[in-house]
Amino acid sequence: MRKWQCVVCGFIYDEALGLPEEGIPAGTRWEDIPADWVCPDCGVGKIDFEMIEIA
C-alpha cells in the first residue's frame, strides 16, 4: 500500500486506511478513487497529490 500527499496542504491519503468518512474503504488504491475526488482539507484535485515514501 502506498501513501499520497497533497502538495498544497500536506494532507496524506494512506491506501491501507482509506477514508471511510469520505466513503472510501480501507485498502482502496489511489487509482480506484474517482477522478473528481478532491482533498478533504483544501479542495484540490487528485492531480495535486504526489506519492510519498514515509521512513
Curated annotation (Swiss-Prot):
Molecular function, one GO term: iron ion binding
Induction annotation: Constitutively expressed.
Transmembrane segments: none
Keyword field contains RNA-binding: no
Entry annotated with the keyword Metal-binding: yes
Pathways per UniProt: Hydrocarbon metabolism; alkane degradation
SUPFAM superfamilies named in the record: Rubredoxin-like
Pfam families assigned to the protein according to its UniProt record, in alphabetical order: Rubredoxin
Subcellular localization: Cytoplasm
Domain Rubredoxin-like: 1-54
Residues the record lists as binding Fe cation: 6, 9, 39, 42
Main location: cytoplasm
InterPro entries: Rubredoxin, Rubredoxin-like_dom, Rubredoxin_dom, Rubredoxin_ET, Rubredoxin_Fe_BS
GO cellular component, one term: cytoplasm
One GO BP: alkane catabolic process
Co-factor binding details: Binds 1 Fe(3+) ion per subunit.
Superkingdom assignment: Bacteria
Cofactor: Fe(3+)
Keywords: Cytoplasm, Electron transport, Iron, Metal-binding, Transport
Family, similarity comment: Belongs to the rubredoxin family.
Role of this protein: Involved in the hydrocarbon hydroxylating system, which transfers electrons from NADH to rubredoxin reductase and then through rubredoxin to alkane 1 monooxygenase.
The protein's name in its UniProt record: Rubredoxin-2
Organism of origin: Pseudomonas aeruginosa (strain ATCC 15692 / DSM 22644 / CIP 104116 / JCM 14847 / LMG 12228 / 1C / PRS 101 / PAO1)
